From Swiss-Prot:
Primary site of residence: cytoplasm
Gene: murA
Subcellular location: Cytoplasm
Binding site for phosphoenolpyruvate: 22-23
Record-given protein name: UDP-N-acetylglucosamine 1-carboxyvinyltransferase
């Protein structure tokens, strides 16, 4: 099993290219099933979850063409949904990826039936699919859950437009319902919708392909269904979580970084906390520069919340920052339970963290010490790498397969910035 070895103590300097967003590309790939002709998606990141989704689309019968080589900069993928014949998404392919449930809406809406195995993914608490099921039922779907599968069908041809109010904000639930409504008959209204940039990106992709969507990025989305979407091209937005991770890494190490072709407006909460920590930040229309040379960060308090609040996917990285910051920082996790599993590993490096329910109280220390640690989920993996960048000696991070689900060539990118980091098999 692969491991990553990090030798700490080197500030990060330079420019880094941010990949396409993992949490945007997965629903967008699913949305190509709604078209009646090939769709080209560009700025596709090379990630384990992306490859899994591609394999799922192939399993369903879709034609998939990798353009310019999957590992080339600016890569794109063309999906031809006209060959789809299969309606069952098997467990052996979905067991490692929760986003597989996003195939439910498009398959049901276009083909009248779908069976999707209950998904797997990061072990960071309960993320039930009941909101997906109830949302699709509001459009006329008949759904049962049995033998580990969500089985859905439409008894009267097409789904029918309807109104649905989410009990709790659900990003993937909003995306599933949005895709299904795009080709349902009539008008659908989605209330208490997720407002994340990735939801907006999906909506913009659907609109590019001929969907009629208004209100994406607000709590109320209105969709006027069309019979089928068209061929088209769409570029995935840059990954705001990868952007934030590199910014935090640079702030922790006392370095300087520049990023081009990013979306600063999607990172207001993160940039605000980095400024609070003492970083000097310059923001352009599509660029971010951060300078933390010669300074130790100050501890920050934060509470995770749905967008536009502080993203839960950046919580672990800021906990790593607080571990070496000056002062005491309080972190409250309100989105997922069990999302403090990285704490025990940070403690092995010498961090001082006290857990009280869903709150972590972090007393900053001057330095951490390298040690063997184990990744427990995707963002925890990133936090351990960040901690390793500032620890004395070597930090060896095991179970990094989590990392490859959401970060494209992170060790290569950090190496270009000056980090001493390598992958070991």
């Amino acid at each position: 099993m692969s491991k990553i070895v990090v030798a700490g103590g080197t500030p990060l300097y330079g420019d880094v290219r941010i990949s396409g967003a993992k949490n945007a590309v997965l629903p967008i790939l699913c949305a190509t099933l709604l078209a009646d002709a090939p769709v080209e998606i560009s700025n596709v990141p090379y990630l384990h979850d992306v490859i899994t989704m591609i394999n799922l689309l192939r399993e369903l019968g879709a034609g998939v063409t990798m353009n310019e080589g999957i590992e080339a900069k600016g890569r794109s993928i063309t999906i031809d949904p006209r060959w789809v014949r299969q309606r069952v998404v098997p467990y052996d392919l979905v067991k490692t990826m929760r986003a597989s449930v996003l195939l439910l809406g498009p398959l049901l809406a276009c083909y009248g039936a779908a069976e999707v195995a209950l998904p797997g993914g990061c072990a960071i608490g309960s993320r039930p699919v009941d909101q997906h099921i109830r949302g699709l039922q509001s459009l006329g779907a008949e759904i049962t859950v049995e033998n580990g599968y969500i089985k859905a069908s439409v008894s009267q041809g097409r789904l029918k437009g309807g109104r649905f109010v989410f009990d709790v904000v659900s990003v993937t639930g909003t995306e599933n319902l949005l895709m299904a409504a795009a080709v349902a008959q009539g008008t659908s209204v989605i209330e208490n919708a997720a407002m994340e940039p990735e939801v907006v990106d999906l909506a913009e992709c659907l609109i590019t392909l001929g969907a009629r969507v208004e209100g994406a990025g607000t709590p109320r989305i209105v969709v006027e269904g069309v019979e089928r979407l068209n061929s088209g091209q769409y570029a995935v937005l840059p990954d705001r979580i990868e952007t934030g991770t590199f910014l935090v890494a640079t702030a922790m190490t006392g370095g300087r970084i520049s990023m081009q072709q990013v979306r600063p407006q999607t990172l207001d909460a993160v940039l605000g906390k980095l400024t609070e920590a003492g970083a000097c930040i310059e923001i352009g229309a599509d660029s971010i520069r951060l300078d933390m040379q010669g300074r130790r960060p100050c501890s920050v308090n934060l509470t995770t919340a749905p967008y536009p609040g502080f993203p839960t996917d950046m919580q672990a990285q800021f906990m790593a920052l607080n571990c070496v910051a000056e002062g005491v920082g309080v972190i409250k996790e309100t989105i997922f339970e069990n999302r403090f599993m990285h704490v025990d590993e940070l403690l092995r490096l010498g961090a001082k963290i006290q857990i009280e329910g869903h709150t972590a109280i972090v007393q900053g220390v001057e330095r951490l010490s390298g040690a063997p640690v184990m990744a427990t989920d995707l963002r925890a993996s990133a936090s351990l790498i960040l901690a390793g960048l500032v620890a004395e000696g070597e930090t060896i991070i095991d179970r990094i397969y989590h990392l490859d689900r959401g970060y494209e060539n992170i060790e290569r990118k950090l190496g270009v910035l000056g980090a001493s980091i390598r992958r070991m098999t």
